[in-house]
From Swiss-Prot:
EC number(s) on file: 2.3.1.274
Pfam families: FA_synthesis
Natural source organism: Aeromonas salmonicida (strain A449)
GO biological process, one term: fatty acid biosynthetic process
Recorded name of the encoding gene: plsX
Superkingdom per UniProt: Bacteria
The protein's name in its UniProt record: Phosphate acyltransferase
InterPro entries reported for this sequence: FA_synthesis, Phospholipid_synth_PlsX-like
Compartments reported by the entry: Cytoplasm
Swiss-Prot/TrEMBL catalytic activity: a fatty acyl-[ACP] + phosphate = an acyl phosphate + holo-[ACP]
Molecular-function annotations in GO: phosphate:acyl-[acyl carrier protein] acyltransferase activity
Subunit structure: Homodimer. Probably interacts with PlsY.
HAMAP family (alphabetical): PlsX
Record's function text: Catalyzes the reversible formation of acyl-phosphate (acyl-PO(4)) from acyl-[acyl-carrier-protein] (acyl-ACP). This enzyme utilizes acyl-ACP as fatty acyl donor, but not acyl-CoA.
Family: Belongs to the PlsX family.
Amino acid sequence: MSTQTVALDIMGGDIGPSETVPAVVQALSLLPQLKLILVGDQHQTTALLQQHGLLTHPRVRFVHASQVVGMGDKPIVALRTLKDSSMRVVLNLVKAGEADACVSAGNTGALMAMAKCVLKSLPGVDRPALIKALPTLSGKRTVMLDLGANVSCDADTLLQFAVMGSVVAEKVEGIASPRVALLNVGEEEIKGNDLVRHSAELLRQCSALNFVGFVEGDRIFSGECDVIVCDGFVGNVALKTAEGVVRMMAQLAGYPRKKRSFLGRLAGFMFKRRFSYLNPDQYNGASLLGLRGIVVKSHGRAERHALCNAILLAAQEAKHQLPLQIADRLESVFSDRDL
């Protein structure tokens, strides 16, 4: 059984070690082949690690980092001045080959800037993209990218995103010949701006893709496609809107019982049971694709169960050697395209 080693920034995020350390315990219990390198300030974490039995755990080692990237730090400042931060160190461990992947719940902008600087892009990748798996009505998951790494893109970049997203759907989600769609304001070929229509032409001409056309925002969770491609501005707005709707529904379901009728309480109970699969914790972890290493960004407010899922995602991507798979596919697609 092959092992996967994941470097974890235990200082990152809004909550920090009080949730990342219990997440480590959970992940180790779920994945016997997992090894973890915990990176953080030893003075702040030693007691907590000892409390959870991790200081002497055979599959855990600790690396001290004297700095922490704050959630409000500017990416360029963090990149230049926080070279011994827990975030930077986990990336260095991946670059050095000591870790197969890394996870951080820290500042998204800083993580993207550091990851691009430390790990560099794969050959043929103009811009890395953030990708995330989403629940669907079919029970399967759809992957969507870009979710905020690039607020503007050209058609060639969206084609690269489509190819990378297809590899993730195949290797990580186990979907054969994944259906690829462009997010648009309508399904008809005449709909959308010049970028979307030009991108559709490129995707349609790419024999390596199973391109099925356009998908509208209200069909993202339908399960009609397996890979949804868009620029980072559109993708981030769509994702944040969906997260807000789920939070609103959850809050409505949890409305104080004494203020609800019997039918209202029954409806709330049924909602929680029927739609538990919508819990964002189950889908925590967005991957920064297109780099020479695996980087998973956990939600900044993620608690232990959600953080555990981000760790497991990183291990799964490492198991499938995702960067190598993406590099091979891109080389195949674009060498054929140049002929």
